[in-house]
Amino acid sequence: MFAVVAVFTALWCLGHPSGVSVSAGSGFYVWQRHWSDKVEAVVCAELEAGTHDLYVLGGELEYENGLARWRGANVPGHVWLHDRITAVFRLPVQALDNPGVSAARVISHAGTRGVHRIQLDVDVPERMIGRYAELVEGIRRRWPVGAGKLRLGATFLPCHLGLKEVRRVLAALDEPVIQLHGIDAPKNRVETWALMKRRTVFRALRAARALDGRFKMALPSYAYVLTFNADGGFRRLYAEGLPDNFDLPPGTVREIAVPDLDLLHEIFTSPLRLPVIWFRLPVRGADRWCLERETLSLLERGERPRATVEFTVRRGGREGTVDLIARYRHQIPLLGVTAAVDWGTCGMEGEFFPLNGCRVMGDAVHGQLPVSVSIAPFACGEPFLVGKAITGADPRRISMKEKEKGK
């Protein structure tokens, strides 16, 4: 598709701003608009580990009644001071109507954050790629000398890589990112859709490598949700958060698009792989629909994570009670599983109280422990209580095992 040597030479002659030919580091997007103590703790731990850069949502430009304003996340000020942090500014397509004015707004907003590592996130229509070039050129040209050395990144879609003027955009950047996931909204539930399409992914990786050796790839660690009206018509796509059922109109149907672990594994074992920026950083205790951190580490090492359910039985808080605990590993569970329970040598006498949406399989009998329990879906990697039991059995003698489907 592209002449690798000729294109690379042409781009190099234009002069890459950073003077770096290959981007080696991987990273995570931190896309929370409202930071909790858990988010801050996970971010600080990741910075302490020092293995990944973090790309933190630093502001979203919005237009209301023709007036532009920034909507920002409540990111703690100390986060912006770290040298592994890049501020991501999300701009609407409308910002490309006047690239010069938008460039000034980006520079001003970066100044309020005190950052000089920034990335632009814009869903650029193909016909406006030239305006995108004007925007990034304007930011670089107008960047204040005393604001620190600018490190400028920007996101691209696969459809951009074959456009002539994409080279002009790249010439003004330090860090280009190709987004390999996304869903084209279907008209109805009958149409097929996928979070990632294999053919598109590998075609984009080849094109990105041919264009510029500094590309990074953005990949999903997070599930997306499509909602459909009761008549089957498409309603809305949620790419950054999943509404609870009670937030949706009656009759709304949800379809969940989870990351394809087989395809992700194929990407990371391919010679076409690039440094990755995951969307997004998992936050234990706050993310129901995100793969766990360990899963992403395995993928980066070229290993295929195996989806399992771990079970633990421990002594309860009161004498004569036990807690049954489950933990989904390396998967974003959608339907839950059924677990068989072996209560050991003390027989089936006792009481069981299911929790967290779990339930007894079959009829619950007073004074008798269940032989199997339906385990509700839960956050990936998070241990959770399946239920509590009153029994004289030794917890060390009690075991749980996932039942095979159909048995």
What would you call each of these model-derived segments?
Residues 218, 222-224, 228-305:
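Substrate-binding cleft of secreted/luminal carbohydrate-active enzymes
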Residues 318-335, 343-345:
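Asparagine-centered strand-capping/turn motif at beta-strand->loop junctions
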Residues 22-32, 57-172, 178:
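Chitinase-like catalytic core of GlcNAc-active glycosidases
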Residues 348-392:
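Intrinsically disordered, low-complexity Pro/Gly/Ser/Thr-rich segments with frequent PxxP/GP/PP motifs
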Residues 54, 120, 176, 217, ...:
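Conserved, mostly hydrophobic/aromatic
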Residues 1-14:
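Hydrophobic membrane-insertion alpha-helices, especially the h-region
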Residues 75-80, 282-323, 336:
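Aromatic-rich peripheral "rim/lid" segments of glycoside hydrolase catalytic domains that contact
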Residues 130-237, 241:
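Substrate-binding surface in catalytic domains of secreted glycosidases
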